[in-house]
Amino acid sequence: MLILISPAKTLDYQSPLTTTRYTLPELLDNSQQLIHEARKLTPPQISTLMRISDKLAGINAARFHDWQPDFTPENARQAILAFKGDVYTGLQAETFSEDDFDFAQQHLRMLSGLYGVLRPLDLMQPYRLEMGIRLENARGKDLYQFWGDIITNKLNEALAAQGDNVVINLASDEYFKSVKPKKLNAEIIKPVFLDEKNGKFKIISFYAKKARGLMSRFIIENRLTKPEQLTGFNSEGYFFDEDSSSNGELVFKRYEQR
């Protein structure tokens, strides 16, 4: 079973590390090509392209400039500990045991605009390059064209290595669009998280993102290997709703706190 999640815009390169083990990203040659393209952009161009403030554009121009192909624990940190958005608040990887990291390294993948696919312990230098950004490159007009089948092929390798054919899609639509489902040697299961608001259940972005992290943690902590085991997920008040679910979609609901 292979879990897919999105990266985060918020990064943490200060907190103490909970493991010293690390691996290197497998697609760095591709990352280097994107860095070459990104370095051509001025801070105002970055601001427009990414729809971010001038201050953030300056920070990211500096990140592109400072990026180097030799990754060490001094200039990079493990991806699962560097990302700090809502998904990662739910995941809480900073509390993982070494055995948890082992299981995650085999069964969890983070999709990335710059790195393509990251394993949890892959070192990562700081960046911001969302998958949906239209960064022109030698392979096309955006990052989807740049990555082509590369991400899908890398996921197929991971599936073959663990000897099964199930992908748990906990990534956002923007990131999962970089995967080619018809070329993926897997059954795709998509958990959906609905929160009650004024008597109606709907996807509330902040809660849904955190729930994706909670579900990832649930799978890792319990060493789950079969999709039917996901229905036992009950973190922070969520419960499985069989009637709303279908073959490829598992629906979890949570009542509004009154």
UniProtKB/Swiss-Prot annotation:
Please give the start and end residues of each transmembrane region: none
Q: Which Pfam families match?
A: H2O2_YaaD
Which InterPro entries does UniProt cross-reference here? YaaA
One GO cellular component, as annotated: cytosol
Q: Please, which domain of life does this record's source organism belong to?
A: Bacteria
Q: Which organism is it from?
A: Escherichia coli O139:H28 (strain E24377A / ETEC)
Q: What is this protein called?
A: UPF0246 protein YaaA
UniProt family annotation: Belongs to the UPF0246 family.
Which gene specifies this protein's sequence? yaaA
GO annotation terms (biological process):
response to hydroperoxide
